[in-house]
Structures are given as structure tokens and as C-alpha cells.
């Protein structure tokens, strides 16, 4: 991992990042929040609370490499039913846009189901993104650091 500078965030830091995004996020209407596991669950709940959105859904996506084509293909372990997304505006929330694969895959799956989406992440790493033509719609900060969020402190302490 090239991001060697570990930065440990406090809950107050997370609150500041969410607060920074809220004016832009609030300028759109959403019917639901889709939090990407695991990192997006807590910021997704915080944002949903601030927007007074009752529908908070989970998207769990993993990637497996196709050895023949050397491509990563998303495997959705958990995802809302297409019929629930059709015609709806969703806000996708994750903690960080590193390579961008998770957010982009979730957005494409929502679009395929007939829904619309915007995305919000606490941190954006444009230098690591695999997508030159895509980025999060909203982000709290741009970083090159390895971010350790308050809900994953043990992970940072153990060096995982």
C-alpha cells in the first residue's frame, strides 16, 4: 500500500466531514440511503439521520479477479431488490473512495434497476481511482493518507 501515513480520525473529525458535505447533499431529494458495507454503514446512518431519511439499505459487494481477463468483477453479497429501487433517487454512502470500484458498481446496479443515485464519501483518493471519468458526487476531503476511522481503531492498532 503506497498510502503509508496513517491518520487516526476521531468522532468529531467524522462529524466535521459529514457537516462539510451536508449543504451540497441537502440540495437534492433522496428517497433512500444505500450504505456500502462495512465502512459506509456508520456515515450512512449519520447522513440519513441528518436528512430524516427512514429507508437505510445495505449494499455488500466484493470483487473477484477473472484470471482469464485480469478484470475484477463485482459479486453482490447483499443488495436491495431491483423493484424497490426502480424510479427512486438513492444516496450511496461509503467511508472512502479508494479505487472507486465499490461505489461505481453500486451506482451501476441501481441504474440497471431503473433508479438514480448520487454518491457521498468521507474521503476521496483521486490518485488511486481506477476511473478517470468518475468521482464521488460529494466528499468531505481529498487525501493520500491511510485513514483509520474511529469505528476501526483496532484495525489500525493491529496494522491490518
Identify what each model region corresponds to.
Residues 1-160:
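PRPP-associated nucleotide enzymes
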Amino acid at each position: 500500500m503506497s498510502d503509508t501515513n496513517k491518520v487516526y480520525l476521531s468522532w468529531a473529525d467524522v462529524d466535521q466531514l459529514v457537516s462539510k458535505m451536508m449543504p451540497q447533499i441537502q440540495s437534492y431529494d433522496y428517497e433512500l440511503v444505500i450504505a456500502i458495507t462495512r465502512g459506509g454503514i456508520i456515515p450512512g446512518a449519520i447522513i440519513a439521520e441528518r436528512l430524516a431519511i427512514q429507508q437505510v439499505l445495505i449494499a455488500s459487494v466484493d470483487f473477484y479477479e477473472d484470471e482469464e481477463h485480469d478484470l475484477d468483477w463485482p459479486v453482490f453479497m447483499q443488495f436491495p431488490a431491483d423493484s424497490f429501487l426502480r424510479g427512486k433517487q438513492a444516496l450511496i454512502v461509503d467511508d472512502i473512495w479508494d479505487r472507486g470500484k465499490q461505489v461505481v458498481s453500486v451506482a451501476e446496479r441501481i441504474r440497471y434497476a431503473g433508479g438514480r443515485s448520487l454518491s457521498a464519501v468521507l474521503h476521496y483518493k483521486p490518485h488511486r481511482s481506477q476511473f478517470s471519468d468518475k468521482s464521488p458526487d460529494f466528499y468531505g476531503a481529498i487525501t493520500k493518507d491511510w485513514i483509520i476511522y474511529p469505528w476501526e481503531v483496532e484495525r489500525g492498532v493491529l496494522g491490518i
